[in-house]
Amino acid sequence: MALKRIQKELTDLQRDPPAQCSAGPVGDDLFHWQATIMGPNDSPYQGGVFFLTIHFPTDYPFKPPKVAFTTKIYHPNINSNGSICLDILRSQWSPALTVSKVLLSICSLLCDPNPDDPLVPEIAHTYKADREKYNRLAREWTQKYAM
C-alpha cells in the first residue's frame, strides 16, 4: 500500500510540482526523499534554498511522513535539529494529504510563523517583540546557511 501511494505521489509531483518546491527519492529508496524549498519572496528567507529530508513510515499514508530541515533556519517553529512544529505532521495528519500539500504548508509557515506554538521560544519572543530584529536575523541565517 505505502509503496504504491509513494510512487503515485512521486509521479504527480514530477508532473505538477508545487510552486517553489521539489522532492524525490534519495537513490533507489522510495521511503527516503530529499526535498527543496526556495525561500518565499515575501519572507526574510527570500533567495535561500532549503533542503529537507522526508522519511515515509511503512504504514504511510495512515501515519505522517517525518519531515525535517537539513539546512539551518532561523524560525520559531523549526529547531536546530530541523524538526518542524506543524500540526499536519502530527495530530492533524490525514491520509488525504500529500507530500505536495505538506511542502506547500511548510512554505506558508516560512511566510507566516506561528509564534504561539513555538519549538524555539526565544525566536518566538523575538518575532513577537521585535519583528525588525527577527527579520534581520532570519535574513542573516539565510545568507549564511542557505545561499
Swiss-Prot record:
Enzyme Commission code: 2.3.2.23
Keyword Transferase: yes
Catalytic residues as annotated in Swiss-Prot or TrEMBL: C85 (glycyl thioester intermediate)
UBC core domain residues: 1-147
Disulfide bridge positions per record: none
Keyword line: ATP-binding, Nucleotide-binding, Transferase, Ubl conjugation pathway
GO molecular function: ATP binding; ubiquitin conjugating enzyme activity; ubiquitin-protein transferase activity
Any one GO BP annotation for this protein: protein K63-linked ubiquitination
Catalysed reactions listed for this entry: S-ubiquitinyl-[E1 ubiquitin-activating enzyme]-L-cysteine + [E2 ubiquitin-conjugating enzyme]-L-cysteine = [E1 ubiquitin-activating enzyme]-L-cysteine + S-ubiquitinyl-[E2 ubiquitin-conjugating enzyme]-L-cysteine
Pfam families: UQ_con
Pathway field: Protein modification; protein ubiquitination
PROSITE patterns: UBC_1, UBC_2
CC terms in the record's Gene Ontology section: nucleus
Gene3D superfamilies the record matches: Ubiquitin Conjugating Enzyme
Function (record text): Accepts ubiquitin from the E1 complex and catalyzes its covalent attachment to other proteins. In vitro able to promote polyubiquitination using all 7 ubiquitin Lys residues, but may prefer 'Lys-11' and 'Lys-48'-linked polyubiquitination.
Family classification: Belongs to the ubiquitin-conjugating enzyme family.
Name of the protein this chain belongs to: Ubiquitin-conjugating enzyme E2 D4
Taxonomic lineage from the root: Eukaryota, Metazoa, Chordata, Craniata, Vertebrata
Gene that produces this protein: UBE2D4
